[in-house]
C-alpha cells in the first residue's frame, strides 16, 4: 500500500502535477443499526458545505489498513469475521491547502502518534467533552461540530456512538489527463486511484481505456 505517496513524489519529480490542494480527513463513526432503523439499509451520503457523512455502510467493521509507517481506517463486510449489527459512517472534511499531500500526511501521522495504536476507537462523548486523544488537534474541531450536526439525523449519536481515527482519503495530487487518460507526457497513462478516481470498477474501466489507446499506438 501507500501507492498514493509514491505517485505523489513521482508526479512531482516528472513535473506533471496540476493541483495539489485537496485534503480530506476525518473519522469513521460506528453506531448500532437499531439507531438507524428508519433508514432501511440505505447507503446514502449526506452533505453540508465541505463535510460529507457517508456512504452509510451496514453490518460490517472498521479495520486498520496499514500504510508503511501508519495505519488508517477502512471498512470490511465481505467475510463473516467482519459481520456486525453496526452502521459505519465515514465523516470527512474537505479543505484546501497549498501543499495538499504534505498536509494530509501530517494530519494522519499526528493522529497516529497521538493515539498510539494502529487505529484508535473512542466514544464520541470523549471528543465532545475535550478528553479525546485527538482533542489537542485543532483540525478536529470541525469534525466535532460535524458530529453535532449529524446527531440531528442519527438518534443518540453523541451519547452511544463511537469514532475511529486516523481517517484520510489517500489520493495523489491531480494530474491533467486527456479524454484517453494520457498525461502531458506522451505514452504515459493513468488509471484508478493514481488518476484520482477511487473504486475497483473505475480502475478496471480506466485500465481498459488506457490499454486500448496503448495498443492503438
Where are the predicted features?
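Residues forming the flavin
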Residues: 1-217
Amino acid at each position: 500500500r501507500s501507492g498514493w505517496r509514491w505517485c505523489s513524489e513521482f508526479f512531482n519529480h516528472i513535473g506533471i502535477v496540476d493541483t495539489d490542494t485537496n485534503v480530506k480527513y476525518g473519522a469513521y463513526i460506528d453506531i448500532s443499526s437499531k439507531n438507524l432503523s428508519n433508514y432501511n439499509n440505505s447507503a446514502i451520503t449526506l452533505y453540508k458545505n465541505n463535510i460529507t457523512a457517508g456512504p452509510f455502510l451496514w453490518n460490517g467493521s472498521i479495520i486498520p489498513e496499514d500504510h508503511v509507517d501508519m495505519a488508517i481506517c477502512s471498512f470490511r463486510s465481505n467475510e463473516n469475521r467482519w459481520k456486525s449489527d453496526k452502521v459505519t459512517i465515514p465523516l470527512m472534511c474537505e479543505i484546501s491547502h497549498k501543499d495538499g499531500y504534505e498536509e494530509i500526511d501530517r494530519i494522519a501521522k499526528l493522529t497516529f502518534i497521538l493515539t498510539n495504536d494502529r487505529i484508535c476507537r473512542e466514544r464520541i462523548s470523549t471528543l465532545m467533552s475535550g478528553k479525546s486523544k485527538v482533542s489537542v488537534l485543532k483540525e478536529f474541531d470541525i469534525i466535532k461540530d460535524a458530529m453535532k450536526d449529524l446527531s440531528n439525523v442519527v438518534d443518540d449519536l453523541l451519547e452511544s456512538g463511537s469514532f475511529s481515527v486516523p481517517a484520510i482519503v489517500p489520493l495523489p495530487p491531480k494530474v491533467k489527463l486527456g479524454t484517453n487518460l494520457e498525461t502531458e507526457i506522451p505514452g504515459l497513462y493513468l488509471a484508478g486511484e493514481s488518476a484520482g478516481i477511487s473504486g475497483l470498477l473505475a480502475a478496471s474501466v480506466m485500465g481498459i481505456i488506457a490499454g486500448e489507446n496503448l495498443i492503438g499506438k
